[in-house]
Amino acid sequence: MNSARLLLDTLRFRGGPPAERLATDWEHAEGTPLQRLVEFEGCSIWLYRRLRQLGVLDRVDPELNDWVSAKAHEETARNLLIEAEAESLATTFRDLGTPAVFLKGVARRLTVDRYPLADARVTNDVDVLVPVDQARDVWRALCRMGYERTNLNAAPRPEHHHLPALCGWRRVAVEVHTTNAQEVAPEEAWRRHYVAGMDVERAGVRYRVPPATELFWSGTAHGLRHPEIAFLLVLFFDAAVIWASGAPVDWAEIVRRLDAKEIVDRTAAGAWLGAAAELAGVEPPAALDGLVTRYDLERELGLRLTVLRRFRPSGALRKALAWWTSERARAVV
């Protein structure tokens, strides 16, 4: 059995083999190596949800079942804590009279009705964008409410795209952004995310979230920040979940930003988008012709699995494995 192909086919948002065939294959799938691969790729909630959809979770390898279930529940509990923090902050910003737009993971979780499975990924913190001329006042107001800096030893970075991270009693990191990236002017970031954004309501609390174009772009740009570990399923997820939903994306604007080198390594971006498209199960639009290149996800996962059958790398070795396998996946196409 090709375990790498099985994982890829199971996680793909569209297309792929029939559910009955996947279910049969999972009954005979190897346990420990796949556990290590899922851990390496950061896709435990995603896999857990898909195995439940297939109705096969209780028929997979017992150790894999126990591990993926426990890991998914642990990460989901963390996500719920972050949701509670976002709800509290939304109320705080309303009381302060400060407009704000929630970014990244929180925004995806708030829009799961528009982007199915968008909440099937661990979220690490709360990122929120506010007007640049109000950011410092908002940050200080949070400090007066009991929030503390997460790292007192870090030197201030006035040029950074967010103020020093804070955390309250929930111990969830909160980053107050003035822009989404250092190469984007604050006023432009506000236009892209807030002005073009949309309101959503949860449990009587109103939030502002970015449009599909910005969620797609931020997933791509954020994923490619560190090229040596950019080609992981958990990072492809952020763009693939938007792509697979069929939500309208301004592809001409995506091309313009690639041409403007908002992502410096355009070649890597083309391969990364090719991988995200395969995972989404979609054909890239004509606007991306010549920009998106094919990426052999099955080869990448297969090479990683070969190593992970023997040992579980960490630190620099983990980064080296991620980088080497991604280079091999790009070289054969």
How does the language model describe each region?
Residues 1-124, 130-333:
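Conserved NTP-donor binding/palm subdomain of two-metal-ion nucleotidyltransferases/polymerases, i.e.
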